[in-house]
């Protein structure tokens, strides 16, 4: 297996990129990684700072990313929700979750959660419910356009008064007297890509209180009563994060995703994939912080010697490395289980460990962003210049620690899953 990739120093890249053997990757992964890396270095990295400052991306970038055989790869394995041949989307025929890991990891090298989310996150979290649970009509009408970069999509779960507490969403969808429409009223908040999305995968209340009364609807931006406004957030500036209002929006009943009042199950199914994506991204961002700090520590001189010659700086770098590499191995193990477990089994078995991995990766990201900023000093407090990536990523940290389930909720979920398994074992004894 050939693995040609430039390496300036250890841990700059995952071990399998260079000299270490791995049981997870094939020649297909190596070739795909090279392809994705070339695209990122040509089309993304030279423009990252500009797009982040503008808080938007050129919409033609979606089409470019599809033409490169990359965009459909973020919706999960098998390729395009198992519809690759039918939808005729571009990409490896042997696509698996390690190919998707490569996409998210390589795009993370740009050092901007906003740019990565602005291009990939809406597709990554908003389209899988349509592909996995939607009708054939929705898959073709919406799914194909999004996969080909002709339209954009976002996931609308969070509300002003319901974030991690999904079971208590207030946005309602009531059947019209004629029975042909759902009439949707409510608000959604912190919606990634909402500013420019053409489609919205929306959690609505179609039944009674609690998780049993939730459904998913596909709402289109052109439907009267849909209003979006950009939110001015701490980080991920180019992500198009928005506040969305649905005011008496008439949605055809054919836009129901899956079965009525089954939406909570679909949302939970989607969360594993979303949280795993956060793990991949956050760990690469931690690696970017380490890479930037390592290089700077070799250039910067204080008290007559390079920063890296001070033991306290080397200790910081060592702490960063050990946490990044350990998290990467945990991430690869989960990815392997995603590739080999039946979907029904993995949905339950991986929920707890993926939640804990999200906590691990976001804490490592936060640690590395802080330590890199300490090594850069004042240079990390300025937008642009030598500390550009570190300054930007420090602002992005909270966007990974909170969405998709806060650290506290994720830790509790991990332990509760373990308790369920314990109770199941005890009941058989």
Where are these regions (language model features)?
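Alpha-helical interface subdomain recognition
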Residues: 1-110, 120, 133-138, 145, ...
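Long, acidic (Asp/Glu-rich), low-complexity accessory segments flanking structured domains
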Residues: 248-266
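Glycine-rich phosphate/pyrophosphate-binding beta-alpha loops
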Residues: 162, 189-195, 235, 273-277, ...
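Active-site-adjacent elements of ketosynthase-type condensing enzymes
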Residues: 161-169
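A short core secondary-structure module
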Residues: 180-229
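Flexible, small-/acidic-enriched active-site or ligand-binding loops
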Residues: 222-252
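A short, Trp-centered hydrophobic/proline-enriched beta-strand micro-motif
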Residues: 149-158
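A structural signal for short hydrophobic beta-strand segments in well-ordered beta-sheet cores
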Residues: 171-175
